[in-house]
Structure formats: structure tokens, C-alpha cells
UniProtKB/Swiss-Prot annotation:
Its main location: cytoplasm. One of its GO terms (molecular function) is arginine-tRNA ligase activity. This is Arginine--tRNA ligase. A motif ('HIGH' region) lies at residues 127-137. The lineage of its organism: Bacteria, Pseudomonadati, Spirochaetota, Spirochaetia, Spirochaetales. GO terms for biological process: arginyl-tRNA aminoacylation. Belongs to the class-I aminoacyl-tRNA synthetase family.
Length: 585
């Protein structure tokens, strides 16, 4: 609704400004129309800045304003205030159209075509197979999952990819510790998920290496060499431990409702990049150093086209082995061939900014793809109150343990409310997932997070459980209304004259714009904070207003339709944020 009104107003304003410019023989390259909310609701529903037009057209603000008002006509109420023209909507029509649109489109409300036909790949999670997922992975996962849903809601064809890092020294460290200290233990014997068991041996390796540094390093290199040469026993151990780890990680994905369209294993595709570099050498796009290593020059400044200040980047070592960047080049080629993407987004922590800047430059230079098609969506670190997490020291919040701890805390609270309630465990899990996902999404993704369990689980304030609770409360209101079996042929929306109702309607009507902005900025926190804004406004309205009034059924019907629209919009937000909707709390 609001999008349509803005488009209509922009067309009319543009027409007016063009006519005024033409009459004054002024050439216009572009007409920039600034629309914003007035600081106070009584001033209007939309403000248009006229001042810039006055400077360009050399006309007074009142003259320009009057011409715009003529063009707008009687469709909206208008009032000039200083450099602004304030617009008031036709409330009755606006309310009716908004509520009807939401309750008709239901789960599709908010969907738009701003990214129609755009093919997007999002690579996220990408865990190592030497440890379980921790809360940092959870932030990566929920950013990737939520952004995928937001981009889909804007019309993009999204493919979600997970590249599991199942080779290299990190898994060899767990393998070495298992060989030394494992005694053929299995996840079944240990009664542990496989990823947790492998993580234990990763910690054991670091304990061993701290006392035997040089020996441990030599043993790791020997083990890695044996794997690369295909030594049967080494490959068998590698296969077994990786399967345990990956099976455990997939269990966590299942719990958190994180899904992928395609899962790659690094061990299956890491050689592709070598061909890209060899071809680049043949075409003169990179060069061979005296020691045999193949290199490329990276400008130290983005705009340093002459390459007079550069640093040398090795793409293939002198012994022919590749580095991570070279493997990533191969991955881009494979995905371009398979999906022919328009853009590929990497959801990776901010500590990898330099790596991706280099990767994108090299991909462009070697003709793999235009670097503008590659995006590093970097996010801030997730820290504990006691400091940064270190998996090698065991100082991490495991994802599974965090979910379990929050579920247990929630269970204690739920048992106070529902002594005989069935399925409390499932309810507690869904509340905990809502708490975690919302807490990790509500902050702008580039910022670091200090994870606070208590705050994340709060049933009041800016939290996932609060959003879930408001949704459950509205559902309870609708159940109560339905049980009254009240006949309602035609809703009279003219009765919704409460200022709180008007504010809620305006928030609901802006949902599509929020999705478009979240898509454009690649920022799920926009949707998270929108959902809190809507939930908070409805909660205030509910406290001050009698929604079901048997003495005024006509008003009751109108307010129930409003409540339905609010609930549908909240549910749509929850879907975009991967927060479970709960009917009863």
C-alpha cells in the first residue's frame, strides 16, 4: 500500500518539477525526491523535502509547493511546513486496503519482485570437520538462512551452498590424537555425537602439541602427506572420523532448521583451481617465479592500475601444491558452470576480509568472473563474557550445548505455567531456537556480539521469545473470538479510528519496503527489528484496548481483522528470521 502511494506521489512530483524546469529553460539530469516520516504523527504520514527543488529551479518553496499540490489534487490532504510538504493519507481507504491485502495474500504478504530473475548463490556455514558447531557458527548459519529467505521473498532465485572443510591439517590433528589416545572408541561407546567426540581429540592434540611442539608438527605433516598419497590406513581413518563429524554437524542443522540446496566436500573439488592458474600462466595473466612458484601481482591500492605498488601472491607453490585461495578459485569456476549465477555471496567472518578482497581481484584478473559478482558478507565475532572463544582450548559455547542449556532453563519456566501440558520439551526447544536466532540477527551483522544467555531468553523486550509470545497472544485472542461463533458478513473498517490502530496499520503496510531494504542491504537485522516494532506496538494496543467487546460486535469484527493482519505479518517475519511460530505459550 505505502509503496504504491509513494510511487504515485513520485510520478506526480516528477511531472511537476519537469514542467517547472521546462518553463524556466533549466536542464535536469536527475530528480531526487526525498520522502520520509514526519517527526510527529500529527504532522502527517509522509514528508517531502522541497528545499532542493527550490535551489535547482531558482523558485521559492511556496511556489513549487503550490504547483505540486495542484498536481496531487484532492486524493491526499497536504500541508506546507517550512521546507517540507506534509501528506496525510485517506485513513479509511488505507486501513481497509492494507488489512484486506494482508489477509488475502497471507504467507505471501510482503513478497516482491525487486530481485526478479536474479540468480544468487549464498555459501554459508562451511564448518571444519574437527569440532562441533559453536555459537559463532550459529551466527553464520542464521545469517545465511535468513538472508536466503529474504532474497527469495524479493524474487531472487537463491541456491544455498555449504562447503565442508574436510581436508588439511585441522582434521589431521584430530586423526593424530585419535591414533595416539583413541583406543578405538566410537560415538556409540562414548555416548556422544560424532562431532563432539572429534572435537575432544582436537583439544587432546593441542594438549599433546603444547608439550611436544616440533614432534607433533612433523607427525602432522607426515600424516597429511600419507593422506595426499592415498595411504590406505590413513584414508580409512580420515573417512571414518570425517563421517562421524559430518553426521553430528548435520544433526545440529536438523535441530536448528538450517538447510542447503547443495553440500560440497573440499576433498572432492580442491584440485579444480590448479587448472585455472595453469591456464592463467599460459595466457600471461600470472607468472612463474625463479623457484617455480606461480604468482600474481596484487595492487596495494584498489585504484593502482599501473601496478607500481604491488605485493606478490603465490597461487601455486614451487612443489605444485595449491593454497586455499587457489582452491576457492576452482570453486567459483565449478559454481559458475553449474549455476551460472549473477552474484555469489560468501557469509564469512570479518577476519577473512583480506582473503576475499584478494580472491575477488584474482578471479577477475584470471577471467573467472567479474569481481563485482562476488560479495563477502562479513559479520562480527561472537564473544563470551569472559573473552574470545578458542576451540583448541575447549573454550567455546557448543551450539548443541547452548541449545540444551536454554531449553532446560525454558523448561523450568514452562513447568510453572503448564503443570500438565504435553510436549513441553518441543515447546522449550522452539522458544530456545527463537531466542538464539533472534539474538544473533537483531544486531547489524558487521558488529561483534557479546552473547548473553539470560538476555536472549527474556520474555520481555527486544527478544525472540517476546516476538513469539506476542504471536501466541494474538492467536489466543483469535481462538476466543472463533469460539464465540459471531456472524460477520462485512467488516466496517471505518470504526478503526484509534491512533494506536493507525500506527499499527502504517507499520504493517511498510513490511514490503522493509523486505526490499533488507534484501538490498543484505541485512536480516532490518527484519528482526521491524518484527519487534510491530509486536511492541500491538502489545501496547492490546493493553489499552478491549478487542473483543460483546456489546459492540461491529467494532469487535474490525479489530479482529486487524489482529489477524498483525499475526500474519509477525508469522511472515518469523519465517524470514527462521524463528518457530508458537500457537500457545
Amino acid at each position: 500500500m505505502i509503496k504504491t502511494i509513494k510511487a504515485d506521489l513520485k510520478n506526480k512530483i516528477q511531472k511537476t518539477i519537469k514542467e517547472l524546469a521546462l518553463s524556466s529553460n533549466i536542464k535536469l539530469d536527475k530528480i531526487n525526491i526525498v520522502m520520509q516520516k514526519p517527526p510527529k504523527s500529527e504532522m502527517g504520514d509522509l514528508s517531502i523535502l522541497i528545499f532542493e527543488f527550490s535551489k535547482i529551479l531558482k523558485l521559492s518553496i511556496p511556489v513549487i509547493t503550490q504547483e505540486i499540490i495542484k498536481q496531487i489534487g484532492n486524493e491526499y490532504k497536504t500541508k506546507s511546513m517550512g521546507p517540507y510538504l506534509n501528506i496525510k493519507f485517506n485513513r479509511k481507504e488505507y486501513i481497509q486496503n492494507t488489512i484486506k491485502k494482508v489477509n488475502k495474500e497471507k504467507e505471501n504478504y510482503g513478497a516482491n519482485n525487486s530481485l526478479q530473475n536474479k540468480k544468487t548463490i549464498i555459501e554459508f556455514s562451511s564448518p571444519n570437520t574437527n569440532k562441533p558447531l559453536h555459537v559463532g557458527h550459529l551466527r553464520n548459519d542464521i545469517i545465511g538462512e535468513s538472508l536466503s529467505r529474504i532474497l527469495k521473498a524479493s524474487g531472487s532465485k537463491v541456491t544455498k551452498i555449504n562447503l565442508i572443510n574436510d581436508r588439511g591439517t585441522h582434521i589431521c590433528k584430530s586423526m593424530l590424537a585419535y591414533k595416539k589416545f583413541g583406543n578405538n572408541i566410537t560415538p556409540e561407546i562414548a555416548q556422544k555425537k560424532g562431532d563432539h567426540l572429534i572435537g575432544d581429540f582436537y583439544v587432546k592434540y593441542n594438549e599433546y602439541a603444547s608439550q611436544n611442539s616440533e614432534i607433533a608438527e612433523n607427525e602432522i605433516q607426515q600424516l597429511l602427506c600419507q593422506w595426499e598419497q592415498g595411504d590406505e590406513k590413513t584414508v580409512q581413518l580420515w573417512t571414518k572420523l570425517n563421517k562421524w563429524a559430518i553426521d553430528g554437524i548435520k544433526e545440529t542443522y536438523n535441530t536448528t532448521n538450517i538447510t542447503f540446496d547443495k553440500i560440497y566436500l573440499e576433498s572432492e573439488i580442491f584440485k579444480i583451481g590448479r587448472e585455472v592458474v595453469i591456464n592463467g600462466l599460459k595466457e600471461g595473466l600470472c607468472y612463474k617465479r625463479e623457484d617455480g612458484a606461480i604468482c600474481i601481482n596484487i595492487p596495494t591500492e584498489k585504484n593502482n592500475i599501473d601496478n607500481q605498488n604491488f605485493k606478490q601472491k603465490v597461487l601455486l607453490r614451487a612443489n605444485g601444491t595449491s593454497i586455499y585461495l587457489t582452491q576457492d578459485l576452482g570453486n567459483i569456476v565449478a559454481r559458475k558452470n553449474e549455476f551460472d549465477f549473477d552474484e555469489m555471496i560468501y557469509v564469512v567472518g570479518s577476519e577473512q576480509i583480506h582473503h576475499f578482497k584478494t580472491l575477488f581481484y584474482v578471479a577477475d584478473k584470471l577471467g573467472v568472473t567479474n569481481e563485482n559478482n562476488l560479495i563477502h558478507l562479513s559479520y562480527g565475532m561472537v564473544n563470551l563474557p569472559e573473552g574470545k572463544m578458542k576451540s583448541r582450548e575447549g573454550n567455546i559455547i557448543d551450539a548443541d550445548n547452548l541449545i540444551h542449556d536454554l531449553s532446560q532453563s525454558t523448561m523450568l519456566e514452562l513447568k510453572k505455567r503448564y503443570e500438565n501440558e504435553q510436549n513441553l520439551q518441543k515447546l522449550a526447544l522452539n522458544i530456545s531456537l527463537g531466542a538464539i536466532h533472534y539474538y544473533l540477527l537483531k544486531t547489524a551483522i558487521h558488529k561483534d556480539i557479546l552473547f548473553n544467555k539470560t538476555e536472549s531468553l527474556s520474555f520481555t523486550g527486544n527478544s525472540g521469545p517476546y516476538i513469539q509470545y506476542v504471536g501466541a497472544r494474538i492467536n489466543s485472542i483469535l481462538d476466543k473470538y472463533n469460539n464465540l461463533n459471531l456472524a460477520n458478513k462485512n467488516t466496517n473498517f471505518d470504526l478503526l479510528v484509534n491512533e494506536n490502530e493507525w500506527e499499527i496499520i502504517k507499520i504493517i503496510s511498510e513490511f514490503e519496503e522493509y523486505i526490499i531494504k533488507a534484501s538490498k542491504d543484505r541485512n536480516p537485522s532490518i527484519i528482526a527489528n521491524y518484527s519487534y516494532l510491530l509486536a511492541k506496538n500491538f502489545s501496547t494496543y492490546y493493553q489499552d484496548t478491549k478487542i473483543i467487546d460483546k456489546d459492540n460486535l461491529e467494532l469487535t469484527h474490525a479489530r479482529i481483522d486487524l489482529a489477524k493482519a498483525v499475526l500474519q505479518t509477525i508469522k511472515n517475519c518469523m519465517h524470514l528470521l527462521n524463528i518457530p511460530y508458537i500457537q500457545k505459550m
